């Protein structure tokens, strides 16, 4: 790997590539133990049991269909809606997950688990302001919720509110001094602020708490490299790869870290390794497309972002980046179409910053 250049550190994809925020573990057992109102259809209890059976079998699509039928019979049961939201999130359908969690919250607004899960889904849609609002509400409702504070720190980091993120991680550590996730995330804030020595100290604490976590070694390696300690930094990266040699997420994060440091060739190799293990890993394809854009390989970028969109039609940034590649290729009408799709998707997800960016791109072409 090339020696890292001093450039802006861009954080890796939320909740996917090594970021230590727990997915919402909303207990699905609640759906199978719901008291059935005698006034409701007598089929409700059977539907709930059947839905649970499909969950146990891992057939989430059928489980969702069954729970939706149950929800039509019992429109006042927030647990059914939260269960559907959970299953949609498990399948990566975060927009649908948001809608069902919002229905659950409408019925039970003071449920901290629902608020946390809504924040998780919003974060995956890259709607960071909405995610922050939900995570804050979760911390207000459950003052001992460590994961909500870590999640809040993550989305504040994405909004460049580094002091707010640091404070959220401090609060998480105060609640749980053994939270390696909080130390790991705090290390990223310190890296962003250029305080590499402190970042190394914090990340070494995370490594002591979680010696088998490859993601911690990746971040530690970044801090060491950017602090000028090349040999130890590369050793940390090698340790990460050794801990999880077949984990495409590790290669994905290595790619993102290298890309953030402008080592585009090294990043490309890491992304390709990730795809070799998991061909449909969206983040790796998106990273390759961004590198192709940077290298002005516009035809390659167009092809790659089309693949990204095939894999995830709700990825607004892919439409936007494809629009940039089409514009650079003098394919104006196609670029307008891509930017318009980006705008529509950003708006649908409530991402105002993204929508403004897409609107500006459209104005330049019209």
Ranges and model annotations:
Residues 44, 78-79, 112-113, 146-147, ...:
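Helix-start (N-cap) detector for alpha-helical repeat units in TPR-like alpha-solenoids
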Residues 99-151:
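Surface-exposed, polar helix/loop patches in the mature regions of secreted/periplasmic/lumenal proteins
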Residues 2, 7-10, 31-45, 279, ...:
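Terminal, low-structured helical/coil segments at or just beyond the last alpha-helical repeat
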Residues 58-65, 90-103, 125-137, 159-171, ...:
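Structural signature of tandem alpha-helical TPR/SEL1-like repeats
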